[in-house]
Regions:
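Positively charged n-region of N-terminal signal peptides that target proteins for export
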Residues: 1-4
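Bacterial N-terminal signal peptides
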Residues: 8-16
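PEST-like low-complexity, intrinsically disordered acidic/proline/serine-rich tracts
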Residues: 20-270
């Protein structure tokens, strides 16, 4: 009788588990909407009650998805991203890209703690903060780790200054198109890489970025590269970043944490 009772209990548990597995799951709650700043624009920031920062995609290939010659499609990439064959390189730029890609980090400016420049800032593995400043009509983009750098996007309607001295991040002005911040940047010094894989550019670069926050947890970044010095036509791509709740900026100094002196010496180690 005891064996029969044990078998009945086991059968009951099995049937209950099967019924639970077949039961429809409750629909997942939709993500919260994006917050807004004092001017009514979408805010890319956190708050005192919503601490966090943005995490970029883990895959190093961002504009075009390639790994050892094979195209891949990480979830963070936008479906409109071009393949390598579709990027309108000038011959010298393609040759330089392939050389850099074959020996990643050997000539990477990041190895010497140089700033990211351009789209690469939105692909940092250390976290990214974007701060709306409605009072001053500015948006600050802050790279949390590595060279601890930042850039300012002016949204007060100003034009690019005449005779601007080229710099790592150039000069950026932005305007709102609905809930998308459209940023026009020029004045780059061409000393950085567009991506972590060594995509080159020249001082003729004009970069158009579109930054939006479709929901609380998602940041969408798109960039169009217009550089007649390195490419035969405009091109671009983009990816999404995820909100990492609870993360805060941490003290990370690239120079103090560099443990690769072999890459710091030689003709590129200035």
């Amino acid at each position: 009788m005891k064996r029969l009772a044990t078998g009945s209990i086991a059968l009951t548990l099995l049937l209950a588990a099967a019924a639970q597995a077949q039961a429809p799951r409750a629909p997942r709650a939709p993500p919260a909407p994006a917050p807004r700043d004092a001017n009514g624009h979408v805010s890319f920031s956190g708050s005192a009650k919503d601490i966090g920062n943005w995490e970029g995609p883990a895959n190093a290939s961002i504009f075009f998805e390639i790994t050892d010659g094979k195209k891949v499609s990480p979830a963070a990439s936008l479906p409109t991203n071009p393949s390598l064959d579709d990027v309108p390189f000038q011959p010298w730029a393609k040759e330089l890209y392939l050389k850099r890609h074959a020996s990643l980090q050997a000539d990477d400016p990041h190895t010497r703690c140089k700033p990211s420049g351009g789209p690469r800032m939105f692909h940092t593995p250390y976290g990214l903060e974007i701060v709306n400043s409605p009072d001053t009509n500015e948006v600050f983009v802050l790279a949390v780790g590595a060279p601890h750098s930042w850039r300012v996007i002016y949204t007060d309607g100003r034009a690019h200054p005449q005779g601007f001295k080229p710099s790592w991040y150039g000069h950026s002005v932005g305007k709102w198109e609905g809930d998308t911040l459209v940023v026009d940047s020029t004045g780059y010094n061409a000393r950085a890489w567009l991506t972590r894989e060594g995509v080159p550019y020249t001082d003729k670069l004009r970069l158009t970025e579109r930054i939006s926050r479709p929901d609380h947890n998602t940041l969408r970044y798109e960039a169009t590269v217009d550089d007649p010095g390195a490419y035969t036509a405009k091109w671009g791509g983009g990816w999404t970043l995820r909100w990492s709740e609870g993360n805060e900026p941490f003290d990370y100094l690239c120079q103090e944490n560099n443990r690769d002196p072999g890459r710091m010496t030689g003709p590129k180690g200035e």
